[in-house]
Design a protein with these regions (language model features):
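GST-like domain detector, emphasizing the conserved glutathione-binding G-site
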Residues: 1-121
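GST-like fold's C-terminal all-alpha helical module
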Residues: 97-164
């Protein structure tokens, strides 16, 4: 498998760390969706990071979908709890971490990539108003719960929140 994308992306980091923790071998190709647009487009015409090129050539994108695939490949190893209550709590934290990532990336795009004369202050305030509650809820969360099997490895919620 080959993971395509820059490690400055929290989504690419999330996939890379998770693949390592699951014990799945992969090659990483550090390719920017900005500076390497044409090369990225030749791999994935949608130009979305992370992109995973599977061993059979199938191209997957979106960190959550890639990790769903990885979880199935790695069975019985998993970064998610087996029990429904534990899974529900883990997915709640993953959702908060993903929301924090998404809103932080939106703010970076708005503040660093959009020309100053085209920025819309109410939009930035709205995005910040979504980011801060997600981070506040994560601050007190119990993230260091071991995944199934009594392993001392971090679970998916801890990985997702750490890279956010």
């Amino acid at each position: 498998m080959k993971l395509i994308g820059m490690l400055d992306s929290p989504y690419v980091r999330r996939v890379a760390i998770s693949l390592q923790r699951l014990g799945l071998p992969f090659e990483h190709q550090s390719l920017s969706v900005f500076r390497g647009f044409s090369e990225f487009e030749s791999i994935n015409p949608v130009v979305k990071a992370p992109t995973l090129v599977c061993d059979d050539g199938t191209v997957l994108m979106d960190s959550s979908l890639i990790l769903d695939y990885a979880e199935r490949l790695a069975r019985p190893r998993s970064l998610l709890p087996d029990d429904v209550a534990g899974l529900r709590q883990e997915l709640r934290l993953v959702g908060l971490g993903l929301a924090a990532m998404e809103k932080a990336v939106q703010l970076v795009y708005e503040e660093r990539l959009r020309p100053a004369e085209k920025r819309h202050a109410p939009w930035g305030e709205r995005v910040g108003g979504q980011l801060h509650p997600a981070r506040r809820q994560l601050e007190g969360a119990q993230l260091l719960q071991a995944p199934p099997g009594g392993s001392d490895a971090l679970g998916q919620a801890a990985i997702t929140v750490a890279v956010a």
